């Protein structure tokens, strides 16, 4: 696992916020995002922002934002019902570049938390985890994704 510690500035995002099991809400949210970005010709980096620990929070209470990164002065276009603006906080993040080709987007996350984090010298900090999709693998099934965990030095 090749993890880098990076400093990220605050990022403004636009997209959809859903609550429920991620295996249901992530595809639903990205379908909504595809339709919205196509309708309004909006482009930007694609991300999933995750709120809640799936090992501690009941699946029906997990939250996800399916979003694109937008400029700081971006405003939602007319006819954007259901879309919202959000902020990914600035901070220190552990970033892991992964390749997914089997449709299992959870496996690299669990490996990141279970294999890297415990002996890394870092602990998870306040804030959401998120992933940044570097390509559209919807046709090929091949995805390159940056996974981000907010971290601080362990004491």
Curated annotation (Swiss-Prot):
Domain of life per record: Bacteria
Keywords: Cytoplasm, Stress response
NCBIfam families cross-referenced by the UniProt entry: PRK10016.1
Entry keyword annotation includes Cytoplasm: yes
Similarity section: Belongs to the DNA gyrase inhibitor family.
Function as written in the Swiss-Prot or TrEMBL entry: Inhibits the supercoiling activity of DNA gyrase. Acts by inhibiting DNA gyrase at an early step, prior to (or at the step of) binding of DNA by the gyrase. It protects cells against toxins that target DNA gyrase, by inhibiting activity of these toxins and reducing the formation of lethal double-strand breaks in the cell.
GO molecular function: DNA topoisomerase type II (double strand cut, ATP-hydrolyzing) inhibitor activity
Pfam families from the UniProt entry: GyrI-like
Coiled-coil ranges from the UniProt annotation: none
Name assigned to this protein: DNA gyrase inhibitor
GO cellular component, one term: cytoplasm
SMART domains: AraC_E_bind
Alphabetized PANTHER family for the sequence: DNA GYRASE INHIBITOR, TRANSCRIPTIONAL REGULATOR YGIV-RELATED
Keyword Cytoplasm: yes
Protein location: Cytoplasm
Subunit structure: Interacts with DNA gyrase.
């Amino acid at each position: 696992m090749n993890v880098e510690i990076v400093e990220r500035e605050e990022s403004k995002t636009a997209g959809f916020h859903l609550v429920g099991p991620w295996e249901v809400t992530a595809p639903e949210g990205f379908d909504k995002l595809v339709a919205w970005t196509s309708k309004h010709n909006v482009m930007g980096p694609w991300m999933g922002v995750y709120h809640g620990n799936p090992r501690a929070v009941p699946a029906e209470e997990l939250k996800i934002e399916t979003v694109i990164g937008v400029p700081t002065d971006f405003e939602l276009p007319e006819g954007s019902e259901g879309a919202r603006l959000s902020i990914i906080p600035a901070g220190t993040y552990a970033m892991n570049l992964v390749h997914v080709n089997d449709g299992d987007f959870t496996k690299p996350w669990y490996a990141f938390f279970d294999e890297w984090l415990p002996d890394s010298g870092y602990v998870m900090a306040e804030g959401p985890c998120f992933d940044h999709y570097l390509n559209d693998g919807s046709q090929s099934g091949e995805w390159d994704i940056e996974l981000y965990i907010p971290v601080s030095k362990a004491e």
